[in-house]
Regions:
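Conserved glycine-rich cofactor-binding loop
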Residues: 76-77
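Conserved glycine-rich Rossmann-like NAD(P)H-binding loop of the short-chain dehydrogenase/reductase
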Residues: 91-106
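Rossmann-fold cofactor-recognition segment
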Residues: 113-129
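Substrate-binding pocket helix/loop in short-chain dehydrogenase/reductase
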Residues: 160-161, 168-171
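Active-site helix of classical SDR
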Residues: 184, 220
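Residue(s) in the substrate-gating loop at a strand-loop-helix junction
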Residues: 204
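C-terminal helical subdomain
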Residues: 244, 264-299
Length: 323
């Protein structure tokens, strides 16, 4: 049933791996109490917010027990779309989030017809103030309980920092970092209280090195890595899995349509579907970092050996805009 509801090429990659991800083992807290800071937030904390701020009216409340779901942001393209295809194997209900209703409806139709899964569609632009509050309210109004949270929404662009607009920098940080943090804050307490759940935060190998001419984007991915590492340790005792996905370049139609298709770099890219398989498997195993692909692993390894000034110089030489 269908109901209405990264990043640049450098952000996504894949891993040589066979098989499909298994279902994450559910760990339980037993008699261990949940700290006060992890208690569930007030479900009606923002009654004054307009219902249609994100582009759709809140779904009508449902009766009965909450429906467990996997919520995927940035669901309509690249890694996000492939993650949806993987998650339907272990989740009967998907909540997909994106900016384009048309693309979301197309994806929902595809998933529901191919996998016989219940798909809920939510339109939201995370760069807009208050968008997360409205999304969370809509999800709860639909009687959905987020069992797996996938923070995949994000974007980036290349330009000298001093020459780029502050408004665009703010939108990048809001989308890549603040929205991710707010969604974790909204749903992690419920997961901890239940004693199970999973959070997959999509970072990038870009977060391991400085990124001249893409400084804010690289820094935003470093935040995702650091934040996920801390969250991993805090939520692990409560049975909640946390994984930071740190891919490198992903294979896109560009490689098939351009002369670059047979270059060495093109051969090092991997498909988004293989990235998704690696990510879901890592989350099931509660691995903190997932860096799929040869190139991604090489970048991560090299970042630990090379001085940061050297790494910054190398990134600058690759990313400096041509005049």
């Amino acid at each position: 049933m269908v109901l209405p509801e990264n990043v640049m090429g450098v952000v996504s990659a894949g891993e040589d791996a066979e098989g499909r991800a298994g279902k994450a083992a559910e760990a339980h807290c037993g008699a261990q109490s949940v700290p006060e800071r992890l208690q569930s937030p007030d479900l009606h904390a923002h009654p004054e917010l307009p219902a249609d701020l994100t582009g759709m009216a809140c779904p009508l409340p449902k009766q009965g027990a909450p429906v467990l779901c996997a919520l995927v942001t940035g669901a309509t393209g690249g890694i996000g779309r492939e993650l949806c295809a993987e998650l339907v194997r272990d989740h009967g209900t998907l909540a997909i989030v994106g900016r384009s209703r048309e693309r979301l409806d197309e994806l929902a139709k595809h998933l529901s017809e191919r996998y016989d899964v219940d798909v809920r569609v939510f339109v939201a632009d995370f760069a807009q103030p208050g968008a997360i509050d409205v999304l969370v309210a809509q999800v709860r109004a639909a009687n959905l309980q987020v069992e797996t949270l996938v923070n995949n929404a994000g974007f980036g662009y290349d330009a000298p920092f001093a020459e780029s607009s502050l408004e665009r920098q703010r939108a990048l940080v809001q989308t890549n970092d603040m929205a991710l943090m707010e969604l974790c804050h909204a749903f992690a307490p419920d997961m901890a209280a239940r004693g199970h759940g999973g959070i997959l935060n999509v970072a990038s190998v870009a977060g391991f090195v400085p990124g001249p001419y893409m400084s804010t984007y690289y820094a935003s991915k470093a935040f995702v890595q650091s934040f996920s590492s801390a969250l991993y340790m805090e939520l692990r005792p409560h049975g909640v899995h946390v994984t930071a996905l740190c891919p490198g370049p992903v294979r896109t139609p560009f490689w098939d349509n351009a002369d670059a298709g047979e270059t060495a770099l093109a051969r090092l890219t991997i498909s988004a579907s293989r990235v998704a398989r690696a990510a879901v498997r890592a989350l099931a195993c509660n691995r903190l970092l997932c860096c799929p692909g040869v190139l991604a692993k090489a970048i991560v390894f090299g970042s630990r050996l090379v001085p940061r000034t050297w790494a910054a110089a190398a990134a600058a030489s690759l990313q400096k805009p041509k005049k």
